[in-house]
Amino acid sequence: MVTSVLTKFDEIYNARQELESKNLSFIDSNFKRFLRRVIRDREGGLGDYLKSWDVNYTYDFVNNEINFSDNILDLGCHKSELVPILHAAGYKNLHGIDLNENTKFSIDPHEFKFKKGDFYNMPIESESMSCVSAISVIEHGYDGAGLFREVSRVLKPGGYFIASYDYWPTKIDIMDKQHFGLSWIIFDTDEIKKMDDFAASNAMKKIKASQTFDLTKPVIRFDGFDYTFAVSIYQKQ
């Protein structure tokens, strides 16, 4: 089962309020988003309001488990709000990887190091990271065997992999839909079990949920499909 799951929309609102109360909210204001639409800026700003729950959940876990001096790698970091959040919180050894070479943050290059690449052949030294994060990216072009093999390679023993993704307990047929030029999957219960198996075969163990979840109806509607978000956390043994 997942480590955590978004069960109602209020959790998104509450997560954003928490980030704002800690001065850790970096998404554009409504006015900035309006201006971007006016000038037809397809790149958009940092982050996504709908990902507030994922981002805040990940930040809280990192804040509780990872030292400020540890190396943290964010997968699919282009426009990621997590990177500036962690930097503002005091983390100074941040790394990011993305296929988009235009990824830029207003952060000292000694404190954030970006490399162009994909998740399945990362230009990252083995056993160099204490934490790898992936906010809503693994469902695009997903290759479970390749992903967990490579994440396990770059993680130090005891390090964590935190992944949020699109989820619904039963299978949703997305009819070969693609986003960002990549295949897309809404993970279901069977796919999560397979994910756990990929992790186990690469010396990674899932952090179990601390509670049961009352998921009665979808929270997210996107591209004609109804689902929610979930998070799985694994620790390298």
Locate predicted features.
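Class I SAM-dependent methyltransferase SAM/SAH-binding core
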Residues: 77-121
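Conserved class I S-adenosyl-L-methionine
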Residues: 68-78
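Class I SAM-dependent methyltransferase Rossmann-like catalytic core
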Residues: 21-22, 33-65
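Core SAM-dependent methyltransferase catalytic element
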Residues: 210-237
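A short glycine-rich, Lys/Arg-flanked "PGG" loop and its adjoining helix->strand segment in the class I
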Residues: 145-157
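Conserved Class I S-adenosyl-L-methionine
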Residues: 174-206
